[in-house]
Amino acid sequence: MSCLPDWLAAGCRDGDAASHPTIRLRFRTATVHYLAEFDVVVVGAGHSGCEAALAAARLGCRTLLVTMNLDTIAWQPCNPAVGGPAKSQLVHEVDALGGEMAKITDRTYLQKRVLNSSRGPAVWALRAQTDKREYARELKQVLEATPNLTLRQGQITDIHLGPHDEICGVGTFFDVHFACRAVILTTGTFLGGRIWIGRKSMSAGRAGEFAAEGLTATLERLGFETGRLKTGTPARVDRRTVDFGVMEVQPPDPELRWFSFDPRAWVEREQLNCYLTRTTAATHQVIRDHLHLSPMYSGDIEARGPRYCPSIEDKIVRFADKESHQIFIEPEGRDTPELYVQGFSTSLPETVQIAMLRTLPGLEACAVLRPAYAVEYDYLPATQCYATLMTKRVEGLFCAGQINGTTGYEEAAAQGIVAGINAARLVRGEALVILPREGSYIGTLIDDLVTKEIREPYRMLTSRSEYRLVLRSDNADRRLTPLGREIGLVDDERWGLYQKKIAAITCERQRLETTRLNARDLPVHLAAKPGSITLADLLRRPGLHYGDLESLNQGVLLDAQVREGVEIEVKYSGYIERQNEQIERVSAQHARVIPADLDYERLSTLSKESREKLNRIRPRTIGQAGRIGGVNPADVSALLVYLELAQAGRLTPAAP
């Protein structure tokens, strides 16, 4: 059965599914020949595009994944690593919904470490150094083996609209056209990409690959606002020319942890070391002497770069009083001599880069295999999207990843799976899914993107979530796997494993809350006062862990994930309950829906700036309205009063 509109599907049933319908190419009509019919077309095969394509195909949609180079699918062009603060939570959540990133990482890691382990569980962050070639190869194999999914090399330049401004197809640079109901744009840094080394530049999405030309003009003709952003990547050096003996070893953690909640994806393997060195006074002097050659400081690049991943020249300028900066030396794979110089991103000329690198302890004789460079690219401010990631202007057009203004593989994957789910649901005539910000980091990420006017690359941080104590890595499956199951991305075996885990956590929590120990049976340092104490109250004491219960012969044999989940839920139960109560209180007010056709210009109680912002962004709820820059608490209160009066029938929606 065709999922295309009747007027288009009728023309796609002849012969080899080719058709010659007349479609609208914005301001003009044209007759095109559709080579094939799909339900969903995904443009770009980076981390966002891969998750989007897999989600749509697994939900039964005939999906086409179009990439400019089939050999660089799921490539990690910058740091070959997954996870880190806030990013690991995103990876766990993608996995909980039924995505792929966590599984691939658990098969291709070179090293794993838990960051912030000395702090509370809300900010624990698993990080993996990955083998970039193995990662790309493994994920490509998954894509190629997925039913309903077709991979094709090409460059999409045209988006075809039907009579009601709905998606009906796409066209390539070489005039090959595909009919479809939904399009997901995951263009990364390729959209109008230009790379810079010193004062010289060339058109490229990344080093050695063409930029995507033509699509930006199409989007602008469709009425979308576009902008420019910038990012960069450091040089790669030859490990055979590096002296690791003068560096600080960064070994993997002794206890192996996993990104995926599915044990079927876990692969134990030998891990490698990373290394730490630091910049020196000589490094800083070389940079200062050549700062005028940086395209960022000469004015050649005007696009904004990522605030939380600055270039080394930015660090030297912004933190002029700092004597040294950490630089991590990380392997890119098991079968390559290339090392990634983390923290040393730059766009200075290549000869200057070599001089800079050779001032670092251990790199005095290093050979550069690939120079660092900056890349600027086009993006669409995501306030033009709903929280479903479908654009407000064109039904069936979704955006995910760097085109929405984000930076990072994890942020891209998180948006990709949401866009893929919703594109499939649109095609199937089902309600689209919105993840609330209080329920996940993915929800927080998307809410920020579609609400706030972002003019620099957005990176997920734990501080961006008001509810990080309940949005932990360990409970991502408890928060999102039921939704993944309902949507259709969690299979029976995975669901069975999830239910078994939940039952084990519930059972052990009940045991800890009901089992009491007499103070006489406890070591002196634990017997605080006479009487008895539950195991749960004992576990809540500072410095005590589940392992201490085992030393008292009061533990039971539990899976590591279950044990950690139980300990966190018990130990922080008071804080968690208070945050859940806060979420309920805030959600009741913030979830209040604003009429889609409300004319803010007629609400004289709102400030002028507020009316302009609200009319442009069109927030869905009171909570979203309050997070828009320029909308202050007084404006939110006035809006609430208006809605209350309108609901009570004391004024008409058309008159304030």
UniProtKB/Swiss-Prot annotation:
Name the source's superkingdom: Bacteria
Q: Spell out the Gene3D superfamilies in the cross-references.
A: FAD/NAD(P)-binding domain, GidA associated domain, C-terminal subdomain, tRNA uridine 5-carboxymethylaminomethyl modification enzyme MnmG/GidA
Q: Where in the cell is it found?
A: Cytoplasm
Cellular component (GO) terms are: cytoplasm
Q: Name one GO biological process term.
A: tRNA methylation
One GO molecular-function entry: flavin adenine dinucleotide binding
Residues involved in NAD(+) binding = 305-319
Leader sequence residues: none
Q: Which residues bind FAD?
A: 44-49
Q: Which Pfam families match?
A: GIDA, GIDA_C_1st, SAM_GIDA_C
Which keywords does UniProt give here?
Cytoplasm, FAD, Flavoprotein, NAD, tRNA processing
User: Which cofactors, if any, are listed as required?
Assistant: FAD
Can you tell me which family this protein belongs to? Answer: Belongs to the MnmG family.
What this chain does, per the record? Answer: NAD-binding protein involved in the addition of a carboxymethylaminomethyl (cmnm) group at the wobble position (U34) of certain tRNAs, forming tRNA-cmnm(5)s(2)U34.
Self-association state and partner proteins as the record states: Homodimer. Heterotetramer of two MnmE and two MnmG subunits.
Q: Which PANTHER family match?
A: GLUCOSE INHIBITED DIVISION PROTEIN A (PTHR11806), PROTEIN MTO1 HOMOLOG, MITOCHONDRIAL (PTHR11806:SF0)
**Protein name, as recorded:** tRNA uridine 5-carboxymethylaminomethyl modification enzyme MnmG
What organism is recorded for this protein? Gloeobacter violaceus (strain ATCC 29082 / PCC 7421)
